[in-house]
Amino acid sequence: MKEFDLESYDYYLPKELIANYPVLPKEKAKLLVYERRSQKITHTTFEHVLDFFPKNALVVLNDTKVMKARLFGSKHALLPSKTTEVFFHRFFKDNTALTQIKGKIKAGDKIFFDANYHAEVLELLHNGQRLIAFYNHKTPLNQENILKLLEQYGHMPLPPYIKRTDESLDAHEYQSVFAKHIGAVAAPTASLHFSQNTLEKLLKDFKHAFLTLHVGAGTFLGVETKDIREHQIHTEILHIPKKSQEILRESQEVLCIGTTALRSVEYFKRLKNSNQESFECDIFLHLANPIQHVNYLLTNFHLPKSSLLMLVSAMIGLEKTKEIYKIAIEKKYRFYSYGDGMLIL
């Protein structure tokens, strides 16, 4: 069936429609609103986004905060050039970290960030990740100090399709105004559209709940299996506080700000009587595993053959997704992380 064929999720996007910078002010970004019942499409901007939110819906937001996850160092302590890139993925046990390191590397190699700080490669893992430990001279760094190191020396982890180095504006624009709990290596991009003023109005006028899904490096990986149902999606750390869990259980209508919030809600709602607050979320939503517990979605325009495009198709159908993306391209909407948005009602 074509809805399970990976090639069905391919499309052509002119390079000039890939957004390399955000629209400022945020309210001026374009917004495509699609109402499923009437099939109506409205073209507007984000200054009007809350006018379209159903009044009785619970709005769910992901308050993860992006780390400065890209570090550059040298394999030799005395070399001034920092050409070895370390992409921090997540903490592992005993203050070690899972990373991706560009170039040839072997266990025992060291990467120097300055005269004091370095990392040592502990193990090369089968999935391309590298297990490393960070040190200040010979003293291992704990998680708190590793985060300080990232903040001091790291760069914002812009997606690979943004063909430029990070700049000072990315430190705040590639971060939502409600980002709170650090741990993501990519921004939940629908959240980037909210200015402080729009957020305050949302929190005042709508029932809402916060959760934290730390977006992982796997979000940039495309689906590679010919049959999308065979794809194994990456695992991400999810935290839903008890207060938010109670609100989610009580709510009939749910509007999610972004696919990360939607995946989190779907994962949580499918659990049987869990008393936990922290989870390992690995839910892959597509037409064979459709959305059951979320009614509305605010999202960006996603990459061809990506799991996020399949999620959108699970909500509105493959053909309708293709139709709307074709319209968005014709109307010169800007795509991907710094691009424009789409509200599905």
Swiss-Prot record:
Pathway: tRNA modification; tRNA-queuosine biosynthesis. It catalyses: 7-aminomethyl-7-carbaguanosine(34) in tRNA + S-adenosyl-L-methionine = epoxyqueuosine(34) in tRNA + adenine + L-methionine + 2 H(+). The keyword GTP-binding does not apply. Pfam families: Queuosine_synth. GO terms for cellular component: cytoplasm. One of its GO terms (molecular function) is S-adenosylmethionine:tRNA ribosyltransferase-isomerase activity. Monomer. Belongs to the QueA family. Transfers and isomerizes the ribose moiety from AdoMet to the 7-aminomethyl group of 7-deazaguanine (preQ1-tRNA) to give epoxyqueuosine (oQ-tRNA). This is S-adenosylmethionine:tRNA ribosyltransferase-isomerase.
